[in-house]
Curated annotation (Swiss-Prot):
Cofactor: Zn(2+)
Residues reported to bind Zn(2+): C16, C18, C38, C41
GO biological processes: translation
UniProt-recorded name of the protein: Large ribosomal subunit protein bL31
Cofactor note: Binds 1 zinc ion per subunit.
InterPro entries: Ribosomal_bL28/bL31-like_sf, Ribosomal_bL31, Ribosomal_bL31_A, Ribosomal_bL31_sf
Family under the similarity heading: Belongs to the bacterial ribosomal protein bL31 family. Type A subfamily.
């Protein structure tokens, strides 16, 4: 690797909006970085993910436009 062309690699303090804090390494200039979602509060990891039921939407569409496509 060439010398002097790579950015400095330093520790960065990451703070989530849920209050979780951790330290990671990055080439970014700032020492502190704020995020909105982390693995402790993301719905996929917490199991609070909602499944959208589209059946009602399909029925509503068919009631409104169903007779337009019949032959």
């Amino acid at each position: 690797m060439k010398q002097g062309i790579h950015p400095n690699y330093r520790e960065v303090n990451v703070t989530c909006s849920c209050g979780n804090k951790f330290v990671t390494k990055s080439a970014m200039e700032k020492e502190n970085f704020n995020i909105e979602v982390c693995s402790l509060c993301h719905p996929f990891y917490t199991g609070t993910q909602k499944i959208v039921d589209t059946t009602g939407r399909v029925d509503k569409f068919n009631n409104k436009f169903g007779n337009l496509f019949k032959r």
